[in-house]
Amino acid sequence: MKKIVVCLMALMALTGCNNGNGNENASSSPSFDEVLTSRRSVRSYDATKKISEAEVRTLLKATQEAPSWANQQPTKYYVAISPEKLAAVQDMVGGNKERIKDAPVLIVSTFERGKSGFFQGNQTNEVGDGWGAYDNGLSNCYLILQARAMGFDTLIMGMREADKLRELFAIPESETIMAVISLGYRAEEPNRPERKSLDDIVKFF
């Protein structure tokens, strides 16, 4: 519970940040609720709008505030921003290729195994490296929410050719490749998917 509270408090602070680059979407800082409700998994990007390396650095810096097991910080990011690397990664995301072909940035998200969920090299409970995946998810959550706060859009893709990505970015064997995240500006306004009712997911005792 403490980790969740810290996570939410940090995200509220992050979404009050403005990237200061003059983007029309960043003219005013959105509220935390606006960030949550406007975030969508975007599958069509505006090819005329680009994102700078400096903006990506600002975005990824926010992920460093994410909580992790014993502050292990197991998540790593590999950023494709050059035309050559973007084209290569597009061929490694299966059926999502056409959906993200106009995204100006593609980010590979990994985590170091044997960190979260371990103490002095020993697994602390039955979840094991599942804690690394959990912490990676928290970090990616910070990424996509900070992206929305900056006026950007994202899509987390689980379909990816891990072996090819590992070779392309020289990712160590000690890291598990979790996802590829596209980053850009939505080309059209996406629909809001139906959500379960609160009573379907919450039980009070």
Listing of model-derived features with the role each one plays in the protein:
Residues 1-4:
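Positively charged n-region of N-terminal signal peptides that target proteins for export
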Residues 17-205:
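Acidic, surface-exposed loops and disordered segments
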Residues 8-11:
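Hydrophobic alpha-helical targeting segments used for export or membrane insertion
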